[in-house]
Regions:
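Rossmann-like NAD(P) dinucleotide-binding subdomain of oxidoreductase/dehydrogenase enzymes
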Residues: 1-130
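ALDH superfamily catalytic-core signature
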Residues: 59, 86, 92-221
Length: 221
C-alpha cells in the first residue's frame, strides 16, 4: 500500500477550543507529510498566532502558516484557492455546505466536523443520581459551547418526572460568574452575539406550549 501526502491542507477551526482544535488539525496533517494553512476563528486568533511563533523555531518554513481573518474573506479565499488540495473544517452545517460546493469545483478532499448536540438516552432502569451527576458536568462544560455537550435528554416514562426534578435542582446549583472568578463553574459565552443567539433559543422555546422551563430562562448581566 502506497500512501502519499495530499498536499496543502486548509484548516479552519472554531472558537470554542482554539488551541486544542489547532493541535488536532495540525498533528495528523503534518504527520502525513502535508503542509497546513490554518485559519483560526476571528474571535480567538491569539492562541493560534502564539503557537505559530513556537512552531517557527521547530518546523521548516512554510510547513505551517496561520492566516487570521473572517470567514467571508479569508475563509472563502482558502476554500476556493486552486493551490489548496484539501479542506478541513470544524464548524456549523451551513458553512460545511458552502465548503462542499467550493471543494466540488476543484475536486478538493474534505474533512468536515459539523455542529450538533450530543443526545443522552436514559432508560427506566438507569441510576438517576448518576445520570444527573454526569449531565451536570457535561451539559454545561465550557459554558455549553461544545458540540458534544449533553444538552438533549430522552428519558423513559417511569423515571421522567424524577429525572426532570433532580436535573432541575442540579442545574440550579451551578455557580455562574466572571471568567477570572475561581469559584465559578460557568463563565461567560464567547461574545454578545452568541449570548443573544442562545437567549433567542430560550425565548423561542418559551413560546411553545409543550415546553416547560424549570429553571433559569433569563440572561444574566
Amino acid at each position: 500500500i502506497r500512501r502519499d501526502p495530499v498536499g496543502v491542507v486548509a484548516s479552519i477551526a472554531p472558537w470554542n477550543y482554539p488551541l486544542m482544535m489547532m493541535a488536532w488539525k495540525l498533528g495528523p496533517a503534518i504527520a502525513g507529510g502535508n503542509t497546513v494553512v490554518f485559519k483560526p476563528s476571528e474571535q480567538t486568533p491569539l492562541t493560534a498566532l502564539k503557537l505559530a511563533h513556537i512552531l517557527a523555531d521547530v518546523l521548516p518554513e512554510g510547513v505551517v502558516s496561520v492566516i487570521a481573518g473572517r470567514g467571508q474573506t479569508v475563509g472563502s479565499t482558502l476554500i476556493n484557492h486552486p493551490g489548496v488540495d484539501m479542506i478541513s473544517l470544524t464548524g456549523d452545517v451551513a458553512t460545511g455546505k458552502k465548503m462542499l460546493d467550493a471543494a466540488a469545483k476543484t475536486v478538493k478532499r474534505t474533512h468536515l466536523e459539523l455542529g450538533g448536540k450530543a443526545p443522552v438516552i436514559v432508560f427506566d432502569d438507569a441510576d438517576v443520581s448518576a445520570v444527573v451527576e454526569g449531565l451536570r458536568a457535561f451539559s454545561f462544560y465550557n459554558a455549553g459551547q461544545d458540540c458534544t455537550a449533553a444538552c438533549r435528554v430522552y428519558a423513559g416514562k417511569k423515571i421522567y418526572d424524577n429525572l426532570v426534578a433532580d436535573l432541575t435542582s442540579a442545574a440550579s446549583s451551578i455557580v455562574l460568574g466572571a471568567e477570572d472568578d475561581a469559584t465559578n463553574e460557568i463563565g461567560p459565552l464567547i461574545s454578545q452575539r452568541q449570548r443573544d443567539r442562545v437567549a433567542s433559543f430560550v425565548n423561542r422555546a418559551r413560546e411553545l406550549n409543550h415546553v416547560q422551563i424549570t429553571t433559569g430562562g433569563e440572561a444574566m448581566d
